Amino acid sequence: MMASRRWDILTALLALAVLVVVAYSLLVQGQRLHVAASTGRMSRAMSAGTDARLTGAYRFTRGGWTYVHLEGSPEQIGFQHGYLLAPEIADAFAAVKLDDTHSTKKDWAFFQHAAHDMLWPHIEAEYQAELKGITDGLNAHGVKMTLDDVVALNAFEELPDYYVPWYDKRHKTKKAESVADLKVLGHCSAFVATGSWTKDGQIVMAHNNWTNYMVGERWRVMFDIVPQHGYRMIMDGFPGVITSDDDFGINSDGLMVTETTISDFHGWDPDGIPEFVRSRKALQYGTSIDDYVKIMLDGNNGGYANDWLLGDRKTGEIAQFELGLRAHKVWRTKNGYYVGSNFTSDPEVQKLDTTYNLDDPTESPNARHVRWDELIKENKGKIDVQLAEKFEGDHFDAYTKKDGPDVRTLCGHGDDSPKGDKGWGVKPYDPMGAVQGKVTDSKMAEQMSLVAHTGHPCGEVFHAKPFLAAHPEYNWQAPELRDMTSDPWTTFHSGEHSGD
């Protein structure tokens, strides 16, 4: 009896020992498999990370922005851009593709052909190399986009709104739902001031970017670029695009640049140089206001026509450069201000390049023009970076004389506008408006620094799901429209790292 019980206990202990050994073996094997898998992932990451083209490049996020440092040859800068921002570029590309094809009623192949046959031959070698580099970087990161896709993405401001109307007129086609679908909308509210108009007599420059929320929510990249040739640049930008494109940038020789779009612009030169190339080149190589103007005029294709607001930190001079296709004009001063809200100032540009109605006070560009003049004049001698931040979030409607966000306020909210804007063809409650803001002054520009704000500069947050439930007419945007958060004003400077 006792022997039998001892045998049972021994058998149980042996069985338990076997279970322990088996469990341990499985655990060790699992750990080895996990380590092997992790090592494989790390090895692949390290293999990509040691690509010579990535030398010196890095990224980090802060204040809602993705800061990207790029340096080297055009091929290196492009590869770094494409590789480090691959997820953001793929995401942004999906939104742009949906927006462009919906608004023009043309398939994406149309834009690919335009990029390949019309734009590419007029892009100089330096920027062709950079665009090829972006494509290579994307492909190396597993994002399958072609060079034609990347070029068309870079031209997402000029192809649908400038080339397509010209193309349709030339080919006597009209596939858009209405003429309004192909009107050039206004983008942005901006100003530049200097001399007795600012607190310290230095240049102050500010800008908020207007676009639809679907695309604009993705406009959250801060580029710090050290090119092989030309000047260092810090600028805000869109994933995959080689220029700022909204625009706000500083170069290391003291040039300060921003702009606002000319409303209802008409014109296109298929033999010209793409605007995204000219604006990048002008910021990279411009040493003065004169240089900037010269580079932008050279090969002007009429794409993304803007009123450029410029500053030269070295001299304290500012300028307004109104660039149409058939006409242009430059104003400059060392004691004054210029504002932009998508209106024209030169009668020749108004006559030859646009059909926008400057006399309708109900329309957004005209109402914002009035508000800009009010704010600047009321604050003469007090304007600084902090005041400029407040200006960019302003909600006073100069037409209704009431405070509240809508499509006529400097901080635009199309989704809060029951009537939209007839001059632009903006429909009621259109999810568009101010999507981010930037400010700098001469002292900050000397340090290659600026402050930037993601989302509405006023701080309000846009929520996509309840908006679409209330306005199902915009459900076509549902695959790509998402919440647009608002982060605090954040300071960035050239050459910084995440811990700075």
Where are these regions (language model features)?
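N-terminal Sec-pathway targeting helices
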Residues: 2-15
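Hydrophobic membrane-insertion alpha-helices, especially the h-region
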Residues: 12-24
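Flexible, small-residue-rich N-terminal segments that precede or flank a structured functional core
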Residues: 347, 352-354
